[in-house]
Amino acid sequence: MSIAFRESELVSILGQSGCGKTTLLNIIGGLDQYTSGDLIINGQSTKQYKSADWDIYRNHSVGFIFQSYNLIPHQSVLSNVELALTLSGVSKAERRRRAKEALEKVGLGNQLNKRPNQMSGGQMQRVAIARALVNDPDILLADEPTGALDSETSIQIMELVKEIAKDRLVIMVTHNPELAEKYSTRIVKLLDGQIVGDSDPFDPAKEPAHSEVKKTEVTKGQKTSMSFLTALSLSKNNLMTKKGRTFLTSFAGSIGIIGIALILSLSNGVQEYINSVERSTLASFPVSIQHELSLIHI
């Protein structure tokens, strides 16, 4: 297929299950690699992209919204959104500021310290949207963002997505044609991996994009990595929220180790005792060996 997107529009991808909607989304987001053809980003081919280049592209230029939210249950709402910035080398104070702004933008500025299990499905999806926006990506990819929500909450989420699409490209996979017709500026229909309908096709040659600075080029040299201290802090928080299970696991492991040590010690002691009995018994009944020479006359 061949398709191009404008810098700011809300594109809905429609089609039956298995027609390639999610695969298309994953290729655009750099999650899957194409086997033929090319993915051109801001006029630049990605054929020569290495793993580090894809990491930079995913981390700085693309935001992902999934149907299942993918929030970390033991982290607060604010920490979940901040986590998207940990790979960008952003300072803690800056992470906190940007995360708060993103949550306020989606209407959750007064629920920063709640846990995901204390929120409704619509609120968790708003947290996921805030997490996708906190890096200020050029492209927002949404895979069934309203699939697990009721109709009223779906409308609220779509209103939010429509507002976001005013200053960036939003590509959404959905099975809901009614929502797509109402909120999208463009609808693309797929069938067996091919485009069979496009309500507002875009030709870059006839309608060139007007962008002074390309974020992909600006962030080309930036390194994406998580510091050891950050990873240690996340692990510690995970353990602290599961104290009971951690204690029981440690206790059971300790019993197992102690049991193995006792068995080995007992086995070694029994073997040593048997050897000692053998030595003392043989010492009480010495065995003498005599050598006799017999002469045979023929």
Where are the predicted features?
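Alpha-helical transmembrane segments
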Residues: 245, 258-288
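Conserved small/polar residues in nucleotide/adenosyl-binding loops
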Residues: 297-298
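Conserved ABC ATPase signature
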Residues: 115-125
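The feature captures the beta-strand-to-loop junction immediately N-terminal to the Walker
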Residues: 14-16
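Catalytic Walker B motif of ABC-type/P-loop ATPase nucleotide-binding domains
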Residues: 140-143
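Conserved catalytic motifs of ABC-family nucleotide-binding domains
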Residues: 136
